[in-house]
Structure formats: C-alpha cells, structure tokens
Design a protein with these regions (language model features):
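PRPP-associated nucleotide enzymes
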Residues: 1-264
Length: 264
C-alpha cells in the first residue's frame, strides 16, 4: 500500500489489473511517501509515484518512509540465488529520494546499500512495552539479535538479558537444534522476547517451549515486523506467548487477540 501525504494511491485497477492512479491537487513541494510492502506490485506503484512527483513539481523534496525493506533477508551472495536486496536498493537509490526512513532492518547491509538512509529508533517501542507490562528479563532468540540489540537498546537498570542459540539446516532452513544460553532462574518470571521479524514464528515457538520448561510465567514478544504468515504457523495456536507486540510495517490481519499494534 502506498500513500502520498496520507492520500492512498494506486489502490484501484482496470479489468486487466493495470493500476489506476488518481491524484489530488497538492499545494506543496514537500512529500512523504509511506510504502507498506504487501506484494511486488507496490514497488511498481512506488516508482510511478516518484516519477510523477519529479515530473510535475519543481525539485520536490520527497521522503520515503519504508519501515520494512523488501528482500532484506536476502542480504548476501549465496550460490544459486540472486542477491535481490542489492538490486532492490539500487532501484530505490535510482529514484533519488531526499531521505529514506527504515525500521529495524534485518542487517546493516540494508542501511549500507541504501543512499541517504536513516533508521527509526525502536527504543520508543521497547520503552512503551516496559511502561505497560511487568517484565523481569529480556530474551534475545539468537546470537544475531543478542549482538545487535544489546548494543543499541537501553534496558531499565534492573533488567538483564539472556539469549538463545539455534542451528539451522542451511539447505532447508529448518531449525535442528535450539538451546538457552546463560539462562538465569526464570521460575515464575515474565520474559520479553525481542527480535526484528516474525514469519511463521517457528523460532519463537521453540524459544517459548524452552522458556516454559524453565518455569517462565508470562512470555511476551516484540517484533518490529510481523508477516500475515504468522497465522499459518503454530505459534499462535501453541498459546505459549501471552502477547505479541508489533508495528504496522507489514501486518494487515489483526484478528488475533494476542497481537497488539505498537507505536500507532
């Protein structure tokens, strides 16, 4: 979904599925395009919008808000696969936005590849959760999240963290082993899991099982980006988690009473 200064655009189509681009009369040369990725169609709509603004307005200042960056998981060269993030970022760079705002990218490769890129600070979302909930420990579900968030997040003085370690089959992507590292006594304690992305939720289900085995009480999850595919996985049905906090960067199905929109 794309909006220009909060005005939806490209959301209607002709019978053959070509987009209809209804425009409004803008009395400004300052624009914020909000890009919420749902399908690759949104990329073509984005291109049309930026080309239009550049064509009609004299040197417009156009800021792109792209909380979730498509293809950010494909952030390296892997034999037999296209380095798709690289080419997507090249496409965005070619559009020459004044600024590109992103949220909690999968790795720093994304922010390195994007020109004039600034990151939205997730500290505000974590602080909001601590204001609402009684949290005893923070848990990072893997080494990557531990290394990343332990550097950039400021936790309350009385809160410490521990983390998980997972081993995947690189061919199938399936997690074949999961363990808790440096786990304190969490009997009857409330745990907040923090990570960037949830697809089917397999990692968080494994983490929830391990935390419950150690006696954890409430388990909450914060992810910056949550895909609708969470409903196709076992995480919600498992009832291991008590609440899931996420932004509106991807998710459009808020039907589960476990999922809460944060930062809205």
């Amino acid at each position: 979904m794309i909006t220009i200064n909060d005005y939806p655009i490209g959301n209607e189509c002709y019978p053959n599925n070509e987009r209809i681009y209804k425009i409004k009369n803008y009395d400004t040369d300052y624009f914020v395009i909000d890009f919420k990725y749902e399908t690759d169609l949104d990329i073509s709509i984005l291109i049309m919008c930026k080309k239009y603004l550049d064509d009609v307005f004299n040197n417009p200042k156009v800021i792109l808000v792209m909380k979730y960056v498509p293809y950010s998981r494909m952030d390296r060269n892997i034999e037999g696969y296209m380095f798709s993030l690289k080419y997507f970022c090249q496409l965005i760079n070619d559009l020459k936005f004044h600024k590109v705002l992103v949220l909690d990218t999968h790795s720093n490769v994304t922010t390195t590849l994007l020109d004039r890129c600034e990151e939205i600070d997730i500290q505000q979302y974590i602080d909001e959760i601590f204001d609402k909930e009684k949290i005893d420990y923070v848990f990072y579900p893997d080494n990557g999240s531990m290394e990343r968030y332990s550097e950039i997040l400021k936790l309350p003085n009385d809160i410490t963290y521990f983390y998980g370690n997972k081993k995947r089959d690189l061919q199938t992507g399936k997690i074949i082993n999961y363990e808790l590292v440096d786990c304190p006594d969490i009997q009857n304690k409330n745990i907040l899991i923090i990570d960037d992305l949830c697809a089917f939720g397999g990692t968080f289900k494994l983490a929830g099982e391990k935390l419950k085995e150690k006696g954890a009480n409430d388990i909450l999850l914060y992810v910056s980006h949550c895909e609708n595919s969470i409903y196709k996985g076992e995480l919600i049905k498992s009832k291991l988690l008590d609440k899931i906090y996420t932004t509106d960067s991807i998710l459009s199905d808020w039907s589960s009473n476990l999922i809460y929109n944060i930062g809205d």
